[in-house]
Amino acid sequence: MAEPILHIEGLDKKIGSKQILKQISMDVMEGEIIGLLGPNGSGKTTLIRIIVGLLKQNSGSVTISGFQHDTEFEKAMEAVGAIVENPEFYPYLTGWENLKHFANMHKKIADERLDEVVERVGLTSAIHDKVKTYSLGMRQRLGIAQAILHRPKLLILDEPTNGLDPAGMKDFRDHIKELAEMEGTAVLFATHLLREVEDLCDRVIIIQKGEIKAEVSLQGTDQTTEKAIIEVQPQEKALNWLTGNQYQAESQDGTIVVEVAKENIPELNRSLVGQDLNVFSITPYTQSLEDEFIKATTAHQEEGEELV
């Protein structure tokens, strides 16, 4: 079995007496895009800062590309590229000069690699312009180029689409998807935007109050449903019949949600009608990421101060 690029186990962080992160554990595999989703103040940024070495955890471990954070920090960081909100550059230098300056901090980054990443992020025509003339979207693309210049195995993104218009956000997503597919880069994408996660990620980890509340796979969400919503009367009689016939069913908002393959819905409908039940509709049931997010966060709702 392949080893994860990022492995976090039992991570705790306190500031003073306040618990900021509580027993965080996760894996990110090669070529996988993982969304770290949570409201502002959920602990996402604190976790990102620990991963990139800007903060120290109280307990737990971080392993990147097989290197322990605590004992082999420099080797671990060689495998990391990061964009934290809006990337900063020297505005009086060109995009190329900024990348060249960054490349000089690493070993053996040839100009051919600079050309490659510039083309990948779509900045070829503007790379020799001064960065002060760049739009926010162009700066973000330059940020991606800088972050992947040294071929990191792990790319960390913390709210990277802040301030981008819809076209810029789509452009950004396309570049990240291509990066994961073409170079096998593992991506951890922290955001509070549901739509961004749905459009970009393979899997989402929902975090609130410093704890992981749920993990949801976003792959295969268009497959045939295994649940249906039934509007039927009398509802209690229908529910009793379903559970008595080995169906997994429950009442929900005046309807019944039942586990049933799509191809078996006509047979189920005939059976219900045969029990003198009035069936008004049977529709496929799909639970959106928004539903999952609300379910995970409201089920653990607590009073207290916000995290950072």
Swiss-Prot record:
Binding-site positions, ATP: G38, P39, N40, G41, S42, G43, K44, T45
SMART domains for the chain: AAA
Membrane found in the keyword field: no
The keyword ATP-binding appears for this protein: yes
Cross-referenced Pfam families: ABC_tran
GO MF annotations, alphabetized: ATP binding; ATP hydrolysis activity
InterPro entries cross-referenced by the UniProt entry: AAA+_ATPase (IPR003593), ABC_transporter-like_ATP-bd (IPR003439), ABC_transporter-like_CS (IPR017871), P-loop_NTPase (IPR027417)
Span of domain ABC transporter: 6-234
Record keywords, A-Z: ATP-binding, Nucleotide-binding, Transport
Family note: Belongs to the ABC transporter superfamily.
Record-given protein name: Uncharacterized ABC transporter ATP-binding protein YdbJ
Gene source species: Bacillus subtilis (strain 168)
